[in-house]
Amino acid sequence: MSFRLWGRCIFFFCFLLEAIDSRGGRRGGKGKGKSNLQFAQVAEFSLVQTVLSDNRSAQIITGSHFSQTYRLGYKLLIICKARGDPRPTIKWYKEGAEIQPKASIHYYEKPIENDTIWSKLEVDPATMGDQGVYACVANNPHGVMAKNFKAEYTY
């Protein structure tokens, strides 16, 4: 991927971080548990760069629900599926930083067809620190597309 495209990706994630609302507090309504979600205005899909008339560009075709709620100590699971020609690669980000696998964080990829890939991000056990904005970024030489997920914990 060219330096210019990476620059646009970094700009996109910086823009995403600026959109995070710093006001905390409880979520309205009745129900069990408390929400400490510290962001509010996050777009679900972001088209970073693509030629719209080019059907070969990376496109996220399905994924987990935009707003994820997880219980502390249990598994947080996010799924993303992308298509393009050539088959795109998928990278996972949290708050704009690329996620690196570690003891409690794993991601898996599975090619489905010549032009499609499926990826799953697992955080197990999930903690308060795992709350935030996650992004699945699909990339191929013809374009980049991102799908955001808001994850918040409950007791």
Swiss-Prot record:
Phenotype seen when the gene is deleted: Disrupted localization of levamisole-sensitive nicotinic acetylcholine receptor subunits in 80% of mutants, and this is mostly in conjunction with the disrupted localization of the associated transmembrane protein lev-10 and secreted protein lev-9. This results in increased sensitivity to the acetylcholine agonist levamisole.
Source domain of life: Eukaryota
Cellular compartments per GO CC: extracellular space; neuromuscular junction
Signal peptide residue numbers: 1-22
Subcellular localization: Synapse; Secreted
Residues linked to a glycan: 55, 114
Keyword Glycoprotein carried by entry: yes
Tissue-wise expression: Expressed in body wall muscle cells, the pharyngeal muscle cell pm6 and in four head neurons.
InterPro entries, per database record: Cell_Adh-Cytoskel_Orgn, Ig-like_dom, Ig-like_dom_sf, Ig-like_fold, Ig_sub, Ig_sub2
Cross-referenced Gene3D superfamilies: Immunoglobulins (2.60.40.10)
Disulfide bridge map: 80-136
The UniProt record lists the keyword Membrane: no
Domain annotation Ig-like C2-type: ranges: 73-154
Function recorded in the entry: Required for the localization of acetylcholine receptors at neuromuscular junctions and for subsequently controlling the response evoked by receptor stimulation.
Record note on quaternary structure: Interacts with the non-alpha subunit of nicotinic acetylcholine receptor unc-29 and lev-10 to stabilize the complex formed between unc-29 and lev-10.
The protein, known as: Immunoglobulin domain-containing protein oig-4
Species: Caenorhabditis elegans
GN (gene name): oig-4
